Design a protein with these regions (language model features):
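Conserved alpha-helical substructure of the radical SAM core
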Residues: 1-5
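Conserved AdoMet/S-adenosylmethionine-binding subsite of the radical SAM
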Residues: 14-162
Length: 162
């Protein structure tokens, strides 16, 4: 029927067993399930059942500019799974040198095609977004990545605390 269920917020794969039960309920009650798309930080391996139901994934790996320790935010086996399973990759960029990490820890080691990569400005307000977006958009053009604005900042001028 064309319905898409986008599952995001914090790390949704923490709840993947419960979400699979929810899908079973939907299928039993309605006779169909929507297309599922996750936004994940790529630290938890998706259950193989998600592949069976055709779920798609957008990964947003936390980079060192996030401040979390590397052992909590960088899981090579999970990143490898996402690169093999055609997930999209979204990176929050503060400055051009952040691309050293994007290429060195993600693009090159996992052979991620540039067409599956989105860059977003690292910012906490509408004003900061307006200031940084042109630089990030130019980097996206230069390296043949996609660019995505942070719509919640542009529309509501508020950062999401997830």
């Amino acid at each position: 029927n064309g319905a898409i269920l986008k599952i995001t917020g914090g790390e949704p794969l923490v709840q993947q067993k419960a979400l699979l039960k929810f899908l079973e309920y939907m299928e039993a009650e309605w006779g169909w399930i929507p297309r599922i798309d996750f936004e994940t930080n790529a630290t938890i391996m998706p259950d193989k059942e998600w592949v069976r139901v055709g779920a798609t994934f957008t990964t947003s790996p936390k980079m060192s500019n996030n401040g979390d320790p590397e052992d909590r935010r960088y899981k090579p086996e999970v990143l490898d799974w996402h690169s093999i399973n055609a997930s999209g990759f979204k990176f929050v960029i503060d400055k051009e040198s952040d691309l050293d990490e994007v290429f060195g820890k993600y693009i090159s080691p996992f052979d991620i095609p540039t067409g599956r990569v989105w860059l977003m400005p690292c910012c906490g307000s509408r004003e900061e977004h307006i200031e940084k977006a042109p630089m990030v958009a130019e980097l996206a053009k230069k390296y043949r990545f996609n660019f995505s604005p942070r719509l919640h900042l542009l529309v509501w001028n508020m950062a999401l605390k997830v």
